[in-house]
């Protein structure tokens, strides 16, 4: 495994691979690796000859009142986990990524202004900045992201399309704890009791899916589910939408997604479930 701290190091490495006609799969992370990240590496190995993982806690996607300083960092443990699993790890500092400071604005479009983009308006602009920069440096053939951050996935796909980048964007399924809680680096903030409470998010989303498949009215379902969520969390949003557009479900909808974001204390949790729409859906 080649460990790269500077842009020039990873650039020289990927140039050599491209000259050898090797394909490159890329997984951007902020570290704090868990089984969800490792599942993306498994996908990457199937999609390309070489696998690169980046570890960079991106300050551009944190608001001033968020957890940039306290975000879980475990670089040594992450590198041990990656040692036998990837070909290179890119660990840049802020000056490598933003040599002229964080100033670029990228229009993330409608998809980036709803749901998480509505309550965290800074997030997708900061996220898309760093992803575009990393794509320019690593020049992958394919990049893999987790389904848990589903809205982020769609924003990235839209960016790749808008910029005509020759990069295939793949996604990996949500990996869950035995309780159903979606794995996340921020789960480290949860106490044992909080983790049990957090599992209610997936339970409620699963219930909504079951009822949607029974053709129950979505407006009624949402009110019931929101009431249930508020028994355990501070609710940010709960939506049942077309999975491809994040708009209201229509006759042309093929897949439905149920998305929610909640707060448990100061910890923000997101989750979603995607499923095929029944032919007789009303």
Curated annotation (Swiss-Prot):
One of its GO terms (cellular component) is cytosol. Its EC number is 6.3.2.1. GO terms for biological process: pantothenate biosynthetic process. The active site is at residue 37. InterPro entries: Cyt_trans-like, Pantoate_ligase, Pantoate_ligase_C, Rossmann-like_a/b/a_fold. Pathway: Cofactor biosynthesis; (R)-pantothenate biosynthesis; (R)-pantothenate from (R)-pantoate and beta-alanine: step 1/1. GO terms for molecular function: ATP binding; pantoate-beta-alanine ligase activity. (R)-pantoate binds at residues 61, 152. ATP binds at residues 30-37, 146-149, 175, 183-186. It comes from the Bacteria. It is an enzyme of class 6 (ligase). CDD domains: PanC. Beta-alanine binds at residue 61. It catalyses: (R)-pantoate + beta-alanine + ATP = (R)-pantothenate + AMP + diphosphate + H(+). HAMAP family: PanC (MF_00158). Belongs to the pantothenate synthetase family. Homodimer. This is Pantothenate synthetase. It comes from Vesicomyosocius okutanii subsp. Calyptogena okutanii (strain HA). The gene is panC.
């Amino acid at each position: 495994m080649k460990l790269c701290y500077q842009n020039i190091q990873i650039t020289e490495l990927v140039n050599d691979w491209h000259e050898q006609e090797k394909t490159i799969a890329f997984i951007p992370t902020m570290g704090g690796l868990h089984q969800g990240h490792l599942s993306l590496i498994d996908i990457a190995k199937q999609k390309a000859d070489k696998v690169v993982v980046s570890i960079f806690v991106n300050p551009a996607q944190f608001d001033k009142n968020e957890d940039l300083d306290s975000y879980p960092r475990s670089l040594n443990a992450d590198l041990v986990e990656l040692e036998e699993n990837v070909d290179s790890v890119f660990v840049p500092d802020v000056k490598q990524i933003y040599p002229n400071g964080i100033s670029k604005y990228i229009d993330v479009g409608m998809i980036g202004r709803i749901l998480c983009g509505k309550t965290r308006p800074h997030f997708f602009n900061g996220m898309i900045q760093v992803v575009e920069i990393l794509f320019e440096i690593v020049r992958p053939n394919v990049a893999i992201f987790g389904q848990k951050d589903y809205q982020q996935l769609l924003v990235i796909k839209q960016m790749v399309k808008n910029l005509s980048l020759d990069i295939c964007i793949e996604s990996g399924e949500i990996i869950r704890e035995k309780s159903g809680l979606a794995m996340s680096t921020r789960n480290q903030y949860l106490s044992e009791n909080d983790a049990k409470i957090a599992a209610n998010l997936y339970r409620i989303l699963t219930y909504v899916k079951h009822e949607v498949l029974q053709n129950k009215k979505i407006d009624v379902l949402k009110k019931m589910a929101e009431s249930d969520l508020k028994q355990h969390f501070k609710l940010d949003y709960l939506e049942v939408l077309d999975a491809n557009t994040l708009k209201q479900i229509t006759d042309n909808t093929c897949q439905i997604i149920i998305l929610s974001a909640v707060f448990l204390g100061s910890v923000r949790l997101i989750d979603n479930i995607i499923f095929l729409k029944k032919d007789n859906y009303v």
